From Swiss-Prot:
Signal peptide: 1-19
Source organism: Homo sapiens
Protein name: Uncharacterized protein KRT10-AS1
Record's keyword terms, sorted: Membrane, Signal, Transmembrane, Transmembrane helix
Cell compartments where the protein resides: Membrane
Length: 258
């Protein structure tokens, strides 16, 4: 950037007028003008000593920066778009597209199969938990049977048994009800999490399939690689259903613990 020459009055010494304030300015760089000598004039002009104009006025700085930003940013975006288009053409022509298609279909298929199997497992456990609660609650709140205790009379045994059953009737239903509520909350959390994963898998699959595109796949080797990849994914998913349930269980426990 071009600096502005310091403007000093005719009666000033350039070394005192400019270089005393800005040490990097050489005394010969000052330009003397036919202006009467005054200390106020030198004090006003001292900031102009070889300082770039863009740093002296904020609006000039903003103007320069905005023009630079518009030029550089648009050129960068244009270059980035050209690069992405070239990468897209290269991607469509190469063997990376079948891999992306395979990953998208694997996400979709794995979310659907693993999630459905684990949902069925959760429903079975929930039914067993509900039957356990239904079988246990009448015991807690129903009429109690006296439990004989050695060293106590019959009335003391009956009163002791009645106190024990009343304490269970007060405590057990609330504890079991809170456990059932917690279990239902976990199931609802997992269901929403599974729905989110399923929607994400569908979106990725459709994006890879439609945007990057099956119409651009070359016939022959790329299509055969895609079909081979798909068959391997389906085979591994069908063989490893138990491991998928275990994996979904670990993910579910990790997600609910956080």
């Amino acid at each position: 950037m071009v600096g502005i020459l310091p403007l000093c009055c005719s009666g000033c010494v350039p070394s005192l007028c400019c270089s005393s304030y800005v040490p990097s300015v050489a005394p010969t760089a000052a330009h003397s003008v036919r202006v009467p000598h005054s200390a106020g004039h030198c004090g006003q002009r001292v900031l102009a000593c070889s300082l770039p104009q863009v740093f002296l006025k904020p609006w000039i700085f903003v103007e320069h920066f905005s023009s630079w930003l518009s030029l550089e940013l648009f050129s960068f975006l244009r270059y980035l778009g050209t690069l992405l288009c070239a990468c897209g053409h290269r991607l469509r022509e190469g063997l990376l597209l079948p891999c992306l298609l395979g990953v998208g279909s694997w996400l979709l298929f794995n979310n659907w199969t693993g999630g459905s199997w684990f949902s069925l497992h959760l429903q079975q456990v929930s039914l067993s938990q509900g039957s356990h609660v239904a079988a246990f609650l009448p015991e807690a709140i129903g009429p109690g049977v006296p439990v004989p205790v050695s060293g106590e009379s019959t009335s003391a045994q009956q009163s002791h048994a009645g106190w024990q059953l009343s304490a269970e009737a007060d405590a057990c239903p609330s504890v079991l009800y809170s456990e059932v509520l917690e279990w239902n909350k976990n199931i609802n959390t997992y269901t929403s999490f599974h729905d989110f994963c399923l929607i994400l898998g569908i979106f990725l699959f459709c994006f890879v399939l439609a945007v990057i595109g099956l119409p651009y796949i070359k016939p022959g080797l790329s299509l055969s690689v895609a079909l081979l990849w798909q068959s391997l994914i389906l085979l591994s998913s069908l063989v490893q259903q138990d491991s998928q349930v275990h994996t979904w269980g670990c993910l579910f426990s990790t997600f609910t613990s956080t």
